[in-house]
């Protein structure tokens, strides 16, 4: 037992690189872990900032494709009126479309 303790103490003194602590950082989104080099840590932080900005930017506005959809307002019991008489075209949903088959 004493010999084992002596060997550990000598290895720590002679080879501090073997037992030195390293900073290990993990990316929360991808789950990738890196060693503690400063350059890698900075790159990972920048990547997290960019990806979190993309997520926030994607949820802050309504896309133009969603605004282009021309869907009527279906209210039961209301008289049949065109939903938007200036821009809505005549189609099956607004009940003015004629089937010509």
UniProtKB/Swiss-Prot annotation:
<dbReference type="GO" id="GO:0005179">
    <property type="term" value="F:hormone activity"/>
</dbReference>
<dbReference type="GO" id="GO:0048046">
    <property type="term" value="C:apoplast"/>
</dbReference>
<protein>
    <recommendedName>
        <fullName>Protein RALF-like 14</fullName>
    </recommendedName>
</protein>
<feature type="site" description="Required for proteolytic cleavage">
    <location>
        <begin position="53"/>
        <end position="54"/>
    </location>
</feature>
<dbReference type="GO" id="GO:0007267">
    <property type="term" value="P:cell-cell signaling"/>
</dbReference>
<feature type="signal peptide">
    <location>
        <begin position="1"/>
        <end position="21"/>
    </location>
</feature>
<keyword id="KW-0372">Hormone</keyword>
<feature type="propeptide" description="Removed in mature form">
    <location>
        <begin position="22"/>
        <end position="56"/>
    </location>
</feature>
<keyword id="KW-0964">Secreted</keyword>
<keyword id="KW-0732">Signal</keyword>
<dbReference type="InterPro" id="IPR008801">
    <property type="entry name" value="RALF"/>
</dbReference>
<dbReference type="Pfam" id="PF05498">
    <property type="entry name" value="RALF"/>
</dbReference>
<feature type="disulfide bond">
    <location>
        <begin position="90"/>
        <end position="96"/>
    </location>
</feature>
<dbReference type="GO" id="GO:0019722">
    <property type="term" value="P:calcium-mediated signaling"/>
</dbReference>
<keyword id="KW-1015">Disulfide bond</keyword>
<comment type="function">
    <text>Cell signaling peptide that may regulate plant stress, growth, and development. Mediates a rapid alkalinization of extracellular space by mediating a transient increase in the cytoplasmic Ca(2+) concentration leading to a calcium-dependent signaling events through a cell surface receptor and a concomitant activation of some intracellular mitogen-activated protein kinases.</text>
</comment>
<comment type="similarity">
    <text>Belongs to the plant rapid alkalinization factor (RALF) family.</text>
</comment>
<dbReference type="GO" id="GO:0040008">
    <property type="term" value="P:regulation of growth"/>
</dbReference>
């Amino acid at each position: 037992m004493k010999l084992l303790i002596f060997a550990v103490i000598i290895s720590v003194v002679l080879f501090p690189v073997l037992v030195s602590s390293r900073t290990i950082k993990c990316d929360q989104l991808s789950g990738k872990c890196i060693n503690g080099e400063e350059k890698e840590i900075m790159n990972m932080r920048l990547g997290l900032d960019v990806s979190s900005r993309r997520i926030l930017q994607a949820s802050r506005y309504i896309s133009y494709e969603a605004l282009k959809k021309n869907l009527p307002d279906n209210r039961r019991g209301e008289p049949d009126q065109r939903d938007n008489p200036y821009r809505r075209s005549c189609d099956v949903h607004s009940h003015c479309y004629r089937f010509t088959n």
